[in-house]
């Protein structure tokens, strides 16, 4: 319900502080939540925030809030005004979005392993799941609320240079991070094909590009197609280790297992 609600670019309500803005959104969310649960009790109902966790979004000229502040305000109002078993959707894009190599994002000074990290993405995804594991953030049953990665993408170009191999490596590595985190429920890519407008701005997120009005798969397309195939995933992602600069995946992901091989 709503898109990246910590940025009024998508959810305009005027000049409001985070408290006033969130209470209005929470009440609208409750209408949708109640309606959906009334006809399908097992549905997951969630709201999304972008990767700006403990800093204000840098784009858009309208009201902007820290994702962490929005989440806490929503959670507190939910506790006050009536229980909802809401879920959280996160859009963990690289920082900056014009580079696919999220594994180097700590060098920007915006991505770290603390709960006060300015940005949360795949480099430090555990920050959001650690936060949601806190007793104060759990649902009424004491369970960690479901977390969905409902929009992520990695550009295949950077500064006019081809970065399709880096993009493919980013898809493999990010999927492995999500699959090895027991608190992540879903992983959804943002683009099947490149958006013309986004590509002009250096954001070639598609798994395929368009050439002469036809889809041409990138390397990332093959990776995404086979990444959760237990018999193919290891070979499909083998190239990515050299791109990232590691010998084995457990150097980066403690207790690593390939998808389907638990």
Task: For the regions a language model picked out, list residue spans one by one.
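Aromatic-rich peripheral "rim/lid" segments of glycoside hydrolase catalytic domains that contact
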Residues: 5, 9-11, 19, 159-262
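Noncatalytic carbohydrate-binding groove/subsite architecture in carbohydrate-active enzymes
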Residues: 19-161
